[in-house]
Amino acid sequence: MKKLVYFYLAAAAMIIASCAQQPQYANRAEKILAEINDPNSEYVVVISHRGDWRNYPENSIPAIESIIRMGVDMMELDVKMTKDSVLVLMHDKTINRMTNGKGLVSDITYDSLMTFNMRRAHNVTTDSIKVPTLRQAFECCKDRILINVDHAQNYYKGIVELAEEMGMTGQVLMKGKKSIDQVAADMAPYKNNLLYMPIIDINKEKGQELFYDYVNRGIVPMAFEVCWKENGEDMEKCVAEIKKMGSKLWVNTFW
């Protein structure tokens, strides 16, 4: 009987010790970010391009909610600004493809935009789904999933101020091909900035120059998005350097 008691006590102690060693995260988004920033993590981060556009309109709140239920780690969304300076989710310059209205986003006020309904796949107009604001998208994603804001450069000030107001600067990512110094200058006016990832066209001279500027200056971003048309020495060396420096590799698998 004593041996049995000792066995259960030892097992309980092992479980407690194991639990104590597990990192504690405030929310799911924080856990995903920790996996990305851990150079030893083999976790594969899954990013959804404009949300679940097969079942809902792309860049819509239902499309975001759907991928969160699926367990996706990051939502890629696109931003445009209305005539009255409201940031909304839209990939195209016009609303023609994604709503039952017509016109440039920049020529339409937010209230006017709300009179139209969004379209899903096969040009089917929904009964009530509206183009969401960036604020609404942030509210939906906060603490639940990371966000990659595409087409963000022209609206960086508004995006970073909104993210800071909502306590989400560490949850929102933007990417680009600007030089290290240009990125630093763009971010200098702000106390808290968005996460940043360089895009590297490794088969092109400018892409190689940008990548090896990071390497030679010892600057390690959270990840590199590497684009290439041909496999070869350029790509192999790039991937090897990324592994060596402890960063991560972002690959677009849908192309």
Regions inferred by a protein language model and the residue ranges of each:
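Bacterial Sec-dependent N-terminal signal peptides
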Residues: M1-A29
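Phosphate-group recognition and catalysis centered on beta-loop-alpha active-site segments
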Residues: C19-W255
